[in-house]
Swiss-Prot record:
Plays a central role in 2-thiolation of mcm(5)S(2)U at tRNA wobble positions of cytosolic tRNA(Lys), tRNA(Glu) and tRNA(Gln). Also essential during biosynthesis of the molybdenum cofactor. Acts by mediating the C-terminal thiocarboxylation of sulfur carriers urm1 and mocs2a. Its N-terminus first activates urm1 and mocs2a as acyl-adenylates (-COAMP), then the persulfide sulfur on the catalytic cysteine is transferred to urm1 and mocs2a to form thiocarboxylation (-COSH) of their C-terminus. One of its GO terms (molecular function) is molybdopterin-synthase sulfurtransferase activity. Its cofactor is Zn(2+). Its EC number is 2.7.7.80, 2.8.1.11. It catalyses: [molybdopterin-synthase sulfur-carrier protein]-C-terminal Gly-Gly + ATP + H(+) = [molybdopterin-synthase sulfur-carrier protein]-C-terminal Gly-Gly-AMP + diphosphate; [molybdopterin-synthase sulfur-carrier protein]-C-terminal Gly-Gly-AMP + S-sulfanyl-L-cysteinyl-[cysteine desulfurase] + AH2 = [molybdopterin-synthase sulfur-carrier protein]-C-terminal-Gly-aminoethanethioate + L-cysteinyl-[cysteine desulfurase] + A + AMP + 2 H(+). PANTHER family: ADENYLYLTRANSFERASE AND SULFURTRANSFERASE MOCS3, UBIQUITIN-ACTIVATING ENZYME E1. This is Adenylyltransferase and sulfurtransferase uba4. CDD domains: ThiF_MoeB_HesA_family.
Length: 483
């Protein structure tokens, strides 16, 4: 027994000594890599002597005369200088997403003198984009955003199979997209190809920014920067993801984040190799209406069990190429919680035929029968609304439905206090039509209102207006504001 304990103690001592030796070797490797990076940076330095750099007796310069004029005020910044400007000119930056983030990022990177900019975006320009996507103009509505932003690039859709072939030709990647599945794909590809990634997002009045996979160490090297999966191992619930179209966005907010992305890209391009311990990864949070508007949260290092950057990674270039990694399945698809039967839905055109005197037409009036409930939030209801419609936000309806579900199953459900008197009346059987912006929330609201007993056990019709106010504009009122 005593011999076994001595053996165990000896093994522990050997392990500790080996780990200490390994830590020392890692430190030596980091110093060597830093020195190699410095030598490489020195190798790119361009020195022109009095006798050199002359053609036919005329002195030549590393930049064109126009470039000195254009970038002069940038080059006198110590962190950039001539060598930084030369690095920018030789850099290749890929921007995925030519929207609210990608437009200002591309604008400022091009203005800074980045030699090659690549854009990937499959969307077309819409009028609703113009207040924040500063590369697009009214004349380009309907064109692909890539064609609008930079004429010589063709439209491209990013898929797992083609992402590596697109990314490999660039030095740094900017994620300017707005959906989780694409974000995970971009991050995975950047890690597997050893590319730094500048990722940003913006919604309403807030934004976030991260520099990921920086320094871009090999898969399994814990000294490398974390990836998107390290920060968010699990994607958000699909139904919780809110787009700018649904949640809204202030142009200057997304512009701020795009400009910051461009700034971080310039820093990565012009700076020497980063020391992970000296520059820990962080998440920058911007809130336009907070004081102060900026704050920083330190991020953890690479996760030991990360699916893409750990030693036991399950996501590889091979899995991307064969398409075995299903990013849409991984992130989930937001499904409609309560799809109604055809009998519970009515088109705007059919509603006008069924109630010709009640439905407003071209500035006409509407009586209180039938009742139209608009379930958009108040800020949207105030933008435009059907005359005499009642605003009951979907959030209010869902909150009441949740309380009803937690009540005694044997008790008679009580109607909520926010219901208008005519709807809460026990004698009222007037039909209720629910409308929202696109026809999705209205279906959920109909289900909840029936759970609350508004249909009087089937005696009162409760249904939704199919297609929402967008369909109303298409079928009834072409002058209806589209936002």
């Amino acid at each position: 027994m005593e011999n076994l304990e001595q053996t165990c103690a000896s093994l522990r001592a050997q392990i500790a000594a080996t780990e200490a030796q390994l830590a020392g070797l890692k430190r030596e490797l980091e110093i060597a890599e830093q020195a190699a990076a410095d030598v490489k940076a020195q190798d790119t330095t361009i020195t022109i002597t009095a006798d050199e750099g002359r053609i036919n007796g005329t002195r030549t310069w590393p930049l064109l005369s126009e470039e000195y004029k254009r970038y002069g005020r940038q080059m006198i910044v110590p962190q950039v200088g001539l060598q930084g400007q030369l690095k920018l000119r030789s850099a290749r930056v890929l921007i995925v997403g030519a929207g609210g983030l990608g437009c200002p990022a591309a604008l400022y990177l091009a203005g800074a003198g980045v030699g090659t900019l690549g854009l990937v975006d499959g969307d077309t320009v819409e009028n609703s984009n113009l207040h924040r996507q500063v590369l697009h103009r009214s004349k380009n509505v309907g064109k692909f955003k890539v064609d609008s932003a930079i004429e010589y690039l063709r439209e491209a859709h990013l898929t797992p199979q083609e992402a590596p072939s697109i990314f490999k030709d660039y030095d740094i990647i900017l994620d300017c997209t707005d959906n989780p599945a694409t974000r995970y794909l971009i991050s995975d590809t950047a890690v597997l190809l050893g590319k730094p990634l500048v990722s940003a997002s913006a919604l309403r009045t807030e934004g976030q920014l991260m520099v990921l996979n920086y320094p871009p160490r090999p898969v399994g090297d814990k000294s490398g920067g974390p990836c998107y999966r390290c920060v968010f191992p699990k994607p958000p619930p699909a139904n919780s993801v809110v787009s700018c179209a649904d949640g809204g966005i202030l142009g200057p907010v997304v512009g701020t984040m795009g400009v910051l992305q461009a700034l971080e890209a310039i820093k990565v391009i012009t700076s020497p190799a980063v020391n992970p311990s000296a520059s820990p990864p962080s998440l920058l949070i911007f809130s336009a209406y907070s004081t102060p508007p900026f704050r920083t949260i330190r991020l953890r290092a690479r996760r030991a069990n990360c699916a893409v950057c750990s030693a036991d990674a399950s996501v590889t270039l091979e899995t991307l190429k064969i398409g075995s990694t299903d990013y849409v399945f991984f992130c989930g698809v937001a499904g409609l919680e309560a799809t109604l039967s055809p009998e519970e839905r009515i088109s705007p055109l059919e509603l006008r035929k069924r109630h010709p005197k009640e439905v407003p037409q071209d500035g006409g009036s509407i009586s209180k029968e039938p009742t139209i409930i608009d379930v958009r939030e108040k800020v949207q209801f105030d933008i435009c609304n059907l005359e005499h419609s009642v605003n009951i936000p979907i959030s209010t309806i869902l909150s009441s439905a949740s309380n009803a579900a937690n009540a005694d199953a044997n008790a008679q459900p009580s109607l909520p206090s926010w219901l208008p008197r005519e709807l809460a009346s026990a004698d009222s059987t007037n039909p209720i039509y629910v409308v929202c912006r696109h026809g999705n929330d209205s279906q959920i609201a109909v289900r909840r209102l029936k759970e609350l007993g508004l249909d009087r056990g089937g005696q009162r019709y409760v249904g939704d207006i199919q297609g929402g106010l967008r369909a109303w504009r298409e079928q009834i009122d072409p002058d209806w504001p589209e936002y």
